[in-house]
Amino acid sequence: MGSPIAASFLLFLAVQLLGQTGANPVYGSVSNADLLDFKNLLDRLEDKMPLEDEAESPQALSEQNAEAGAALSPLPEVPPWTGEVSPAQRDGGALGRSPWDSSDRSALLKSKLRALLAAPRSLRRSSCFGGRMDRIGAQSGLGCNSFRY
């Protein structure tokens, strides 16, 4: 009875040793030629696509930031109201408009909003996950624009 068990155990070991497959089949399935082809493909793609950092020079970025900063500057300072009404205000304004006519102000606000929309992405706020993430996500920038200047 011991000899059939010993013989089957030896046969099992022989089959295991001869037909042993690699422990990591992923490594065996990719050849060196495939890896070289993939590397060449990546090199060609990198040559065709310029990096974002190289696409815009630092001088161009600083000019864009200066333009956006000028467009986002606050409204001109208004002197404090003394409680007195000037004759021009009493008569309806110097040009026949009421003092509450805001066509100039709305035009100024429209131009500032257009400048804000045309501003570079670094000036816009990210609204990912409601603007605030807890613990790990807030520190790592996962899922958000982590490039903040």
Swiss-Prot record:
The record marks R121, S122, C128, F129 as: Cleavage. Residues 145-149 are annotated as: Important for degradation of atrial natriuretic peptide by IDE. Residues 49-103 are annotated as: Disordered. The precursor molecule is proteolytically cleaved by CORIN at Arg-121 to produce the atrial natriuretic peptide. Undergoes further proteolytic cleavage by unknown proteases to give rise to long-acting natriuretic peptide, vessel dilator and kaliuretic peptide. Additional processing gives rise to the auriculin and atriopeptin peptides. In the kidneys, alternative processing by an unknown protease results in the peptide urodilatin. The keyword Disulfide bond applies. Disulfide bonds join C128-C144. It comes from the Eukaryota. Pfam families: ANP. Keywords: Cell projection, Disulfide bond, Hormone, Phosphoprotein, Secreted, Signal, Vasoactive, Vasodilator. PANTHER family: ATRIAL NATRIURETIC FACTOR PRECURSOR, NATRIURETIC PEPTIDES A. GO terms for biological process: cGMP biosynthetic process; cGMP-mediated signaling; female pregnancy; negative regulation of systemic arterial blood pressure; neuropeptide signaling pathway; receptor guanylyl cyclase signaling pathway; regulation of blood pressure; vasodilation. The modification Phosphoserine is found at S127. Belongs to the natriuretic peptide family. One of its GO terms (molecular function) is hormone receptor binding. Residues 24-121, 91-101 form a propeptide. The gene is NPPA. This is Natriuretic peptides A. The keyword Signal applies.
